[in-house]
Design a protein with these regions (language model features):
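Peptidyl-prolyl cis-trans isomerase
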Residues: 98, 107-110, 129-132
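Exported/periplasmic ABC-transporter solute-binding proteins
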Residues: 23-82, 113-116, 124-319
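Short, hinge-like loop/turn segments at secondary-structure boundaries
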Residues: 86, 108, 230-232
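Short, glycine-/small- and polar/acidic-enriched structural segments
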Residues: 95, 110-115, 120
Length: 319
């Protein structure tokens, strides 16, 4: 028997032994149970409740798959993903390099999938006479350099600016800290939180001197399919990039102004995915990226990540 035949026999024997070992290996029921439990839920920042619920409604009706949303603050949503308590989290940030490398070192393949853009909306009580603000003044409010309405608008008599967020650990707070304050935390005593986005709207509606910050997907009037009408019980401020805000240089978080970059408080919504089996979490993240999922985002008043935008000029006849 020549050397080549011996080599072929050795390779064949190795393959057979490998197959026998694979066939004889037993599945790990605890590992399977842990995967299925984590695959049964997704986590999302509470501010995404309206859009995620709508996406899930169409996804479950189309696929008959089931996945339960857990709406919490962004920080805890990511923590659950890192602890393998879920394989999917919706946030307004990518994985940090530490998070990514930690998962890779554990033989995972984490992916951050941009799915949409939304605007961070600044809302005030309907009795507030002022309707626009500069980015510079907004930052000064968050830094505590401005605490009274008349420091921005001399004729405004509403007194202290009562700033209200949804949750101290929410995506809204984190985005403002990172993008507006350069990583510095809020210190002003007139800045607080009321747990949820719905509670922010309710608070602003009842307090004339308040200023609320929420995701724009909470604002759209569901009766208006054109997404150009905001809720009537509060006012949405226009935001200007210039040093002086006027109605002509300030923009509200409408889809077109998110699209063309006029609205400055735009943020990306990510699906953070760590599903190793392409199970239901992967299917749902993929669904949100598909034309149908993107159309749902468009209809909800947000800016889709991948869908084509048709922009039409409207001529108003004043006769």
């Amino acid at each position: 028997m020549n050397a080549f035949n011996k080599l072929y026999q050795l390779v064949g024997l190795t393959l057979i032994l490998g197959l026998l070992h694979a066939c004889g290996s037993k599945p790990n029921p605890e590992k399977e149970k842990a995967y299925q439990k984590a695959a049964s839920i997704l986590t999302a920042d509470e501010s995404f409740y309206p859009i995620i619920d709508e996406e899930l409604y169409y996804f479950t009706n189309q696929t008959l798959d089931s996945i339960t949303p857990v709406y919490i603050n962004e920080q805890d949503a990511v923590k659950k993903l890192m602890k393998k308590e879920t394989w999917l989290a919706f946030t307004t940030r990518d994985f940090t390099e530490y998070e990514r490398q930690t998962l890779i070192s554990q033989k995972y393949l984490p992916r951050a999938i941009p799915v949409a853009y939304d605007g961070l909306a600044i809302i005030v009580n309907n009795s507030n006479p002022d309707s626009c603000i500069t980015i510079k003044d907004f930052a000064r409010i968050l830094k505590g350099e401005i605490t009274q309405w008349n420091e921005i608008y001399p004729q405004n008599k509403l007194g202290v600016i009562d700033v209200v967020f949804d949750n101290p650990l929410s995506s809204t707070v984190r985005w403002c800290v990172d993008s507006i304050l350069g990583g510095k935390q809020f210190k002003a005593p007139n800045i607080g939180a009321v747990k949820t986005s719905a509670a922010v709207i309710d608070y602003v509606e009842k307090h004339p001197n308040s200023l609320g910050i929420i995701g724009s997907n909470w604002l759209n009037d569901k009766r208006d399919t054109t997404n150009v009408t905001f809720k009537k019980n509060i006012s949405v401020m226009g935001v200007s990039k210039l040093d002086s805000a006027t109605r002509y240089n300030s923009w509200k978080p409408y889809q077109y102004y998110l699209y063309n970059g006029n609205y400055p408080l735009r943020r990306t919504i990510y699906a953070l995915l760590n599903d190793t089996r392409n199970g239901v979490p992967s299917s749902f993240a993929h669904f949100v990226q598909l034309p149908k999922g993107q159309k749902i985002i468009l209809r909800a008043g947000l800016l889709p990540r991948t869908a084509n935008m048709n922009v039409r000029d409207v001529i108003v006849n004043k006769e």
